[in-house]
Amino acid sequence: MLDEATIAALAAELHEAARRRIQVRHFSLRHPSMTIDDGYAIQRAWVRRRLDEGRVVRGRKIGLTSRAMQQASQIDEPDFAPLLDDMFFAPGAVSFDRFIAPRVEVELAFVLARPLRGPGVTLADVLAATDVVTPAV
């Protein structure tokens, strides 16, 4: 497990790299004992920074839902993350200038008619709260 100072430093590094549009070396290569929970702690710290800058959480995503993508990423489970307001684009062309190494991965988007609150949310709760399911990139 990473300590709080390391988590904060890595979140700051990620934030600066995104701002400057540069890639960072995989954190897990520099911190071989890093866990999935550490990765989510870094994500939470990075999101807090973005929220402090005025960004707003507009949704959530689940990635690496296919076994092939999990194997390519050397991860054995789907991942999840919040989607911030500046991660949404109007229909039409999207400028590549904003991205470091653009790639497209098609996922399913569940548009909710009402919020889900946990713990204890069931599959039936998700289905009942879902307004529409649509492809997303």
List PLM regions with ranges.
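Active-site microenvironments in enzyme catalytic cores
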Residues: 2-137
